[in-house]
Amino acid sequence: DLTGDWSSDVCSSDLYKIRKDSESFRELSLLHPASQNEIVSFYKEFQYKIINLCGLSDFSIRSPKKIASKYYKKNNMQWVNEYKSDKMIDVTNEMKYKHLTSYFSYHGYRRLYNFFDSYEFMRLERKFSVFWSLDVSRCFDSIYTESINWSNQEKDFSKSNSDVKNTFGSVFNRLMKTSNHNDSSGILIGPEVSRIFAEIIFQKIDRDIKKILQADKLESGEHYEIRRYVDDIYVFSRSDHEALKVYEAVDKSLKKYKLSLNKSKTAKVRRPFVTKKTQVMLEIKSRLKNLEEKLLEKTESDNKLSPKRLMNKHHIIISFANEIKSLCLDDASSYTMACNFLIKALTNISIKFCKRNYKRNFEKKSLSLFSDFFIVIVDLLFHLFTVNPSHSGSVQLCKMTTAVAEFCDKVIPAEAPLIKSQIFSRCLDFFKSSEFSKISHQYSDDTLLETLNMLIVSSCLGDDYMLSTKDLNSIFEINSERTLSYFEIIVLLYYIKDNPTYSVIRSRVISSIHDTLSDMSDIKSSTIKAYLFFEATTCPYLDEQDKVILVKRALESTGLASHLTIGYDALQVTHDLEGVRYCSSWDKAAMMSLLEKKELHAVY
């Protein structure tokens, strides 16, 4: 049974890259399906142990709190939540949403910036005059998997009882190792299970820190307080002397677990607790509020948003973009932060606008006001993304484009061609931009998800707004002899579907599938082969003949069928797989839900 037991002694994870900033990227990992199955079993067996171990420290501001509910109630805001980012379940909202994305519900702050905007942070500033920010150096890459045993029992006991195989620590240790090439040095970056693993270890480190400081006559809540968001540690104290004591205790406790502080990233602030980035964000929020007031008129009586008459759209766009640049002139990283924040904020404004006006009737003379509003939003969004491409930004553009395209088609169809053409034109501008060229040359061996997601953005506009075969070939170098990557294959199949215009490209995509899956003897350990096999055999745009060939090859490689019945078995399994939904979603609505869940999966 190809969808059944895929257990393997050692699985390889597959790395993919997302853009971190203008000069670097972040590597994330895909878990093999076999590892995912083992994690599900592990959660079921040790779910309450995990919750207990993640609730021992009062330093943590984000950790699993309880098991997420399997049920949901109807949510009247479902239309908004199809696009609005909730992603991770909190204890207070888990019953609101149809699609839960985590086994656990979480307490604390969803995003780190929520903590800095909180009343709790204000209270800590009133109480303490010194604030230090500490960073753990290469945290996930440095975590030693065996240290999970040290975090919930004594280190010496763990080492002297290494033959104990079924304890929580030994099972978790083995699970993390086998999912990562049997490597005990470092854990995968990306999956939720890695963050839970790290949280359990840091909960013990938190307690060690508190004990060291108690021995030094320093009490949490009186002399200092610590707040920790995964591996970001924030120290509040009455003086620099006490802050230094806390720093030393943190450093000492980390070293027990083969971790260390990145001294160059330690930031020290006295009241008021305002950094340059905080100042920039406050100014950006003010500028954003002014922009929204220029564009929209709120009607309190019926909760509607109406577009205002804009005398000079280009002036508004240029003026706002220049204001943001000038605020970030002295700090390039602030500009990255600003772009990411504004892309999400402007997307939310556009979705809110669509939601509030979805069932309204409009006079013909007012339709141009809607076009002007959308053109300003679209131009600003694509400008911010093009100068600073990011994975999260590309997902926001997908959400915006889907919402706006649907709104235009249903509510203001006469204006739809103008607005959709504007979005399509800006997609082309991105693919011709210097930033896209830089990404393509900088990471020539990897097609980054930012660029692939932009292809999905253009597909949201409908069949009348498709890239030409020439453009597709140019953007993704499809005509070359190289084998396309897993993500390229999936996105291109989603984009071209069964459109005969792209028959040559489809042939190259199918050829790449067969090249990658020519040898499936290691499919039970190779993440990329396992993913591609299931995606290809469940894709509605592949011919049955190609699917049968792949299934037959898999059955032969895994020894799951007799050579006497291999032909019949392959056909039967192919038909069975047609009803299976794997990771990718082949229709637009399901793809948007998938993109939403994969928005860097906001576990923390």
What are these regions (language model features)?
Residues D1-W6, V10:
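Single conserved hydrophobic/aromatic residue that forms the stacking wall/gate
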Residues S8, R19-E23:
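Nucleic acid-processing catalytic cores of prokaryotic defense/repair systems
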Residues L28-F131:
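Active-site-proximal segment of RNA-dependent polymerases
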Residues I39, Y43, I148, Y247-D251:
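Short amphipathic C-terminal alpha-helix that caps PH/PH-like domains
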Residues Y48, Q214-L218, L259:
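Short aromatic/hydrophobic-glycine micro-motifs
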Residues Y48-Y72, K155-V164, M281-R287, E292-L295:
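Internal, charge-rich low-complexity segments
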Residues R123-V230, V235-L244, E297-L532, A536-Y604:
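Conserved polymerase palm-domain catalytic core
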